[in-house]
Amino acid sequence: VTPLAANADTILYGEARVSVDYIDNHIQGADPYWDVVDDGSKLGVKGTEDLGGGLSALYQWEFSVDMTEGGNFGGLNQKFSGLTGGFGTLTLGTQDTPYWKVLNVIDIWNSSKILNGSTYLGGSVTPETNVNGALSTLPNNVDYQTPIFNGFSAEAMLVLDSDEANTVLGSPNISNNVDIWSVNLKYNQGPYFAG
């Protein structure tokens, strides 16, 4: 049997996100400074395979790439596989949360220092716990996305027994090894978006 990825339509993609920042932490005795900063550059592959009967398999494998310092290859980026069809899309792995997918629409730097998990949560989660934002991308999850109906769609995710979620949110474990749940409802039609 040939592996799925070998037969699937595969796309190689990436994003180079680099900025020149003036940083002033407003700490007494610390001078402001200029720095070249990587704001979430990444490299990845994704693809689909038609399984027939309106059903397709899909996968995505994505890595962080530090464009300024070198190294830092890997990171907590999306790595998942699943099925999609008339029922919607069901995926398993490490993925962006539904919460993040709505907020990400307004953040061109994608989970960087300007809009991160601590900003969204009013400072209740420190950005030092996860450089990508506390609720942006988490492992060990099951995600379901509905089909799109006249611009409306919904998504729900369960994060199951995840060490990363425990590190970020302090062992939440809501019940039966469910660490976090995340949902969204979106409207996206032409130039209009709400979520």
Segments from the language model and where they lie:
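Sec/Tat signal peptide C-region and signal peptidase I cleavage site
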Residues: 2-9
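Outer membrane beta-barrel
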Residues: 9-21, 31-161, 186-190
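Solvent-exposed loop segments that connect transmembrane elements
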Residues: 25-30, 161-178
